[in-house]
C-alpha cells in the first residue's frame, strides 16, 4: 500500500468530470475537438488509476497453504479433480464398456482372441480411411471454388494513358515538331538505303571490268595453200590449275592493220602470271597456318592457234630438265617456328623467253602470208602450230610434281615443329634444374653455418663431385640432341632437291620457223 496515492487520482478524476459536465451545460453548440481533448485527459487519468489498483491486488492476493480432505470446503478454482458425482458416473461407464467386451476377449484362450481383434482393427482402419477420404473431397471442392486474386500483368502507367486517350482524347494529336522529326527520320533511312544500293552497283561494275574476257576472236585459216582468209572463229583453251581447279587464262591475239603491220597486245604477262582467285585464297590460308607463301604458279598454255596444224620440231633443239636446289638454312630461332625459303617458279612465258634467242621478226612473204598470230613475247615471234595434247599432258605432270612438293614441305614443317617442341622442353627442364640447384644451395648454406671447418671441407668435396656428375649428364644430353639433329638433317637432305616442274616442257613447240619455207600440211 506504500507509494500509492489513490486519493489524488480520484480527486483529479472528479474535477475533470465536473469540468466536462459544466462544459456540456454551458455550450449549446459543442466543438468536437474540445470534447475529444477532454475525454483523452479523462481516459489517461483512468488508466493511471487502474495501474495503481493492480499494484494493490498484488499485495492483497492470498492462497491456502494446507488443503483439507473434504472437497466441499475447497473452492472450485483450486480443485485438481472432478466432483464425486462425475467420478462415479465415469466409473460406471467404464465398467459397462468392459463388461460388454469381456465376452469377446478371453485371456485364457489367446488363439480365439486373435480373429475378433483383427476384425476390430480392420473396421477401425476402414472408418479412419473414410474420414480421410471425406476430408480430401471437401478440400478439393474448396480449392475448386476458391477465388484467386487476378495478377496485374499490365503496367498501370500504360492503363492510365489508355484511359486518358479514350475518355479525354489526350495524346492523339501530334505536334508539328514531332511530324517534322518523323519525316526527317524516314528521309534519312531512304537516303541511306539508296546510297548502299549505289555502292553495291559500283562494286559490281568494277568487278565486271576487272574480270578478263574469256573469249577472243582469232582469224581462221584455210586448209589450201592460198592467201585468202575465212571468217573469224573463236577458240578457247582451258589450262587446269593445281588441285583440280580449272581456270580460263586466255591470251589476247596480236592485231593486223590494213598495211599488214603488227600491233602489240594489251600486257600479256598481266593475265598469264596472275594466279586465279582460288589460288590466292589458298595462299592466304597457308599464311595463316604457317606454310610458306611462295607456291609455284601454274603453267598456263597461252596459245591461240588452229588445231588442224601439226608442230614442226627439230631434234637438235630441246630443253633438258634440271633440278633446282633449295636454299634453306637449318637454324631455327629459339621458341619460334623456322621459316622455309623456296625459290618461286617461273611462268611459261618467262621460260620461253629465256630459252628462245632474241631474234627479230623475219620479213613477211606476201605470197605465203600466215594469218596466225600469237600473244607470246608481246608480238615479237610468230611460232608455228602447237600440239595442245602435249601441253595438257605437261600440265598434268606439273600438277603431280607440285603436289609432291607440297607433301615434302609439310613433312619438313612437321619435323621442324618437333624440333622446336623438343627445344622448348629442354629449356623448361634446364630452368627446373637451375631452380632446384638454387634451392639446394640455399639449404646447404643454411646448414654450413652450424658446421665445423672439417665438415665444411667434406661438404665442398661432395658438392664438387655432384657438379662433375651433372656436367657429364648434360654433355650426354647435348650429344644425344646433336645426333637427333643430324638424323633429321639427313632425312631432310633428299627432300631438299625438288625437280623443275618444267622438265617435260619442250621448247620446240614454241620455236620460230622460217615463214618463207613454211608450208602448212593439209587436213587428213
Curated annotation (Swiss-Prot):
GO biological process: protein ubiquitination
Region of interest called Disordered, as start-end residue ranges on this chain: 312-340, 356-379, 430-451
Disulfide cross-links: none
Extent of Low complexity compositional bias: 356-374
Residues forming coiled coils: 117-146, 175-211, 398-478
Chief location bin: nucleus
Keyword Plastid found: no
Protein localization: Nucleus
One Gene Ontology CC term in the entry: nucleus
Keywords: Activator, Coiled coil, Nucleus, Transcription, Transcription regulation, Ubl conjugation pathway
Biased composition (Polar residues): 314-333
Pathway info: Protein modification; protein ubiquitination
Subunit structure: Component of the Mediator complex. May be part of a multisubunit E3 ubiquitin-protein ligase complex.
Similarity comment text for this entry: Belongs to the Mediator complex subunit 8 family.
Biological role stated in the UniProt entry: Component of the Mediator complex, a coactivator involved in the regulated transcription of nearly all RNA polymerase II-dependent genes. Mediator functions as a bridge to convey information from gene-specific regulatory proteins to the basal RNA polymerase II transcription machinery. Mediator is recruited to promoters by direct interactions with regulatory proteins and serves as a scaffold for the assembly of a functional preinitiation complex with RNA polymerase II and the general transcription factors.
Protein name: Putative mediator of RNA polymerase II transcription subunit 8
Amino acid at each position: 500500500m506504500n507509494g500509492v496515492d489513490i486519493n489524488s487520482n480520484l480527486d483529479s478524476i472528479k474535477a475533470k468530470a465536473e469540468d466536462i459536465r459544466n462544459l456540456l451545460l454551458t455550450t449549446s453548440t459543442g466543438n468536437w475537438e474540445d470534447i475529444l481533448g477532454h475525454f483523452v485527459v479523462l481516459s489517461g487519468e483512468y488508466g493511471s488509476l487502474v495501474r495503481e489498483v493492480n499494484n494493490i491486488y498484488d499485495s492483497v492476493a492470498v492462497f491456502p497453504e494446507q488443503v483439507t480432505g473434504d472437497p466441499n470446503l475447497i473452492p472450485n478454482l483450486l480443485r485438481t479433480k472432478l466432483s464425486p458425482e462425475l467420478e462415479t458416473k465415469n466409473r460406471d461407464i467404464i465398467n459397462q464398456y468392459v463388461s460388454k467386451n469381456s465376452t469377446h476377449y478371453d485371456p485364457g484362450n489367446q488363439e480365439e482372441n486373435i480373429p475378433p481383434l483383427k476384425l476390430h482393427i480392420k473396421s477401425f482402419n476402414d472408418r479412419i480411411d473414410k474420414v480421410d477420404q471425406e476430408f480430401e473431397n471437401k478440400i478439393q471442392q474448396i480449392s475448386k471454388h476458391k477465388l484467386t486474386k487476378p495478377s496485374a500483368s499490365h503496367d498501370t502507367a500504360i492503363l492510365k494513358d489508355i484511359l486518358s486517350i479514350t475518355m479525354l482524347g489526350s495524346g492523339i494529336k501530334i505536334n508539328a515538331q514531332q511530324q517534322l522529326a518523323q519525316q526527317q527520320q524516314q528521309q534519312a533511312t531512304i537516303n541511306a538505303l539508296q546510297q548502299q544500293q549505289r555502292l553495291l552497283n559500283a562494286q559490281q561494275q568494277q568487278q565486271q571490268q576487272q574480270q578478263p574476257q574469256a573469249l577472243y576472236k582469232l582469224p581462221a585459216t584455210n586448209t589450201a595453200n592460198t592467201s585468202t582468209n575465212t571468217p573469224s572463229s573463236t577458240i578457247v583453251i582451258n589450262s587446269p590449275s593445281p588441285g583440280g581447279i580449272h581456270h580460263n587464262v586466255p591470251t589476247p591475239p596480236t592485231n593486223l592493220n590494213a598495211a599488214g603491220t603488227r600491233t602489240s597486245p594489251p600486257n600479256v604477262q598481266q593475265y598469264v602470271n596472275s594466279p586465279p582467285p582460288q589460288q590466292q585464297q589458298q595462299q592466304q590460308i597457308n599464311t595463316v597456318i604457317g606454310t610458306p607463301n611462295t607456291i609455284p604458279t601454274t603453267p598456263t598454255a597461252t596459245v591461240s592457234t588452229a588445231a588442224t596444224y601439226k608442230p614442226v620440231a627439230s631434234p637438235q633443239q630441246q630443253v633438258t630438265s634440271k633440278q633446282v636446289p633449295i636454299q634453306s638454312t637449318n637454324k631455327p630461332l629459339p621458341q619460334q617456328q623456322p621459316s622455309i625459303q623456296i625459290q618461286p617458279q617461273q611462268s611459261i612465258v618467262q621460260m620461253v623467253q629465256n630459252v628462245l634467242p632474241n631474234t627479230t621478226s623475219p620479213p613477211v612473204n606476201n605470197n605465203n602470208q600466215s594469218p596466225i598470230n600469237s600473244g607470246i613475247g608481246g608480238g615479237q615471234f610468230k611460232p608455228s602450230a602447237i600440239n595442245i595434247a602435249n601441253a595438257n599432258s605437261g600440265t598434268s605432270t606439273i600438277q603431280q610434281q607440285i603436289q609432291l612438293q607440297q607433301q615434302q614441305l609439310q613433312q619438313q614443317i612437321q619435323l621442324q615443329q618437333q624440333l622446336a617442341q623438343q627445344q622448348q622442353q629442354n629449356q623448361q627442364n634446364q630452368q627446373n634444374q637451375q631452380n632446384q640447384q638454387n634451392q639446394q644451395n640455399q639449404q646447404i648454406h643454411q646448414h654450413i653455418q652450424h658446421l665445423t671447418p672439417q665438415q665444411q671441407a667434406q661438404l665442398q668435396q661432395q658438392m664438387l663431385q655432384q657438379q662433375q656428375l651433372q656436367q657429364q649428364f648434360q654433355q650426354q644430353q647435348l650429344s644425344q640432341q646433336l645426333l637427333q639433329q643430324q638424323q633429321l638433317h639427313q632425312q631432310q637432305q633428299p627432300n631438299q632437291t625438288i625437280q623443275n616442274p618444267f622438265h617435260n616442257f619442250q621448247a620446240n613447240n614454241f620455236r620460230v620457223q622460217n615463214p618463207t619455207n613454211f608450208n602448212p600440211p593439209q587436213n587428213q
